[in-house]
Amino acid sequence: MNFIVYPALDIRNGAVVRLQQGDYARQTRYDDQVLPRAQAFADSGATWMHLVDLDAAKAGGYTLAPLLRQITRATGLQVQTGGGVRSRDDVVRILDAGAARVVIGSLAVRQMACVIEWLQAFGPERITVALDTRQDAGGVWRLPVHGWTEVAEATLDVLAQQYAAAGLRHLLCTDIARDGMLSGPNMDVYTYLRALVPAVQLQVSGGARDVADVVAAKMAGCAGIVLGKALLEGRLALKEAVQHGSVADPGDPLPCGELTEPVCRYRSV
C-alpha cells in the first residue's frame, strides 16, 4: 500500500486553529499563515493535505474555495477538504476550486442516499466520507454531527458497512476523544473497522503524536493518517512522518487509494 500522510490545517475565521475533542470553546489559535504552512507541507515531501472549514462545519456553506485555489496552484498539493458540505452544488464548487477529494461528514450521516448518489456521479475517488465518532458508556461508537454538537441515531459500524456496500472507497474516521489531545490514535477502532470493511481505504485521525503512531497506522493496514496538532506544535517532523509512511511493506493488504489522474472539472455532471 502507498500509505498517505495528510498534514492538516483546520481554519476558523481565517486562522489556523485546533479544537480539543471537537469543542469550539476549547480552541488554540496559531496564526493566519495558511499558504506558507501548506507550502511547508509540500517542501517536507507531502503530496496531500487535509483542509477543514470549521466555520462551515458548524454553520454550513463551505467558505474556503478561494484559499483552496491558492493552495493547489501554489504548492501542487492534492487536497481533500470539507466542512459544511450540504449540497451537490457545494461538491461541484469545491471540486472546481481544485480539490482532489471532497470530505463529507454530517450529511453522510444524515442523508446517506444523497451521498451515495454523489459517489456514483463524481466517482469514489472524489469523495471521502468522514465519520467522527465517540464511544458511549455502553461501548457503542456513536456519530456526533454538525460540528460535533449533536449525536445521530445511526452507529459507526452500521454506516461503515452500508457505505462499503455502496462502493465507498475512502473513509476518514476520527475518534473525537483523542482529537487534539496528543494521546495517540485509538487503534482499536481502526482495527475493528479494517476487519468490518476491508475493501475501504481507511484514514486514521485524532491523537497522532509521533512517528510511532504513523507506523502503527500503516502496520494496521490503514491507507493513511491525518496529522494536525503534533505538526503545529513541532512535536513531529512532517518529513520524518512522510519517510516512515512511505517505507515499503510487503505485507500491505490493500492497493493505494492515492489519486494518480489529473483533477477533473464537474460543471457538466
UniProtKB/Swiss-Prot annotation:
It comes from Xylella fastidiosa (strain M12). InterPro entries: Aldolase_TIM, His_biosynth, HisA_bact_arch, Isoase_HisA-like, Isoase_HisA-like_bact, RibuloseP-bd_barrel. The active site is at D10 (proton acceptor), D132 (proton donor). It holds the Pfam family His_biosynth. SUPFAM superfamilies: Ribulose-phoshate binding barrel. GO terms for cellular component: cytoplasm. Belongs to the HisA/HisF family. This is 1-(5-phosphoribosyl)-5-[(5-phosphoribosylamino)methylideneamino] imidazole-4-carboxamide isomerase. Keywords: Amino-acid biosynthesis, Cytoplasm, Histidine biosynthesis, Isomerase. The lineage of its organism: Bacteria, Pseudomonadati, Pseudomonadota, Gammaproteobacteria, Lysobacterales. The keyword Lyase does not apply.
